[in-house]
Amino acid sequence: MKRTFQPSVLKRNRSHGFRARMANKNGRQVLARRRAKGRTRLTVSH
């Protein structure tokens, strides 16, 4: 049986990366929340 997680850095960054988050309003809200919480890494790419 094939595993469900087949890692790809490109797909990961395109969906969850910093530029993807900045591209729309809700993504920017995600970043704002993570900054407020004090996360060291805001996104997987950054």
Swiss-Prot record:
<dbReference type="GO" id="GO:0006412">
    <property type="term" value="P:translation"/>
</dbReference>
<keyword id="KW-0687">Ribonucleoprotein</keyword>
<dbReference type="GO" id="GO:0005840">
    <property type="term" value="C:ribosome"/>
</dbReference>
<protein>
    <recommendedName>
        <fullName>Large ribosomal subunit protein bL34</fullName>
    </recommendedName>
</protein>
<dbReference type="Pfam" id="PF00468">
    <property type="entry name" value="Ribosomal_L34"/>
</dbReference>
<dbReference type="GO" id="GO:0003735">
    <property type="term" value="F:structural constituent of ribosome"/>
</dbReference>
<keyword id="KW-0689">Ribosomal protein</keyword>
<dbReference type="InterPro" id="IPR000271">
    <property type="entry name" value="Ribosomal_bL34"/>
</dbReference>
<comment type="similarity">
    <text>Belongs to the bacterial ribosomal protein bL34 family.</text>
</comment>
<dbReference type="InterPro" id="IPR020939">
    <property type="entry name" value="Ribosomal_bL34_CS"/>
</dbReference>
<dbReference type="GO" id="GO:1990904">
    <property type="term" value="C:ribonucleoprotein complex"/>
</dbReference>
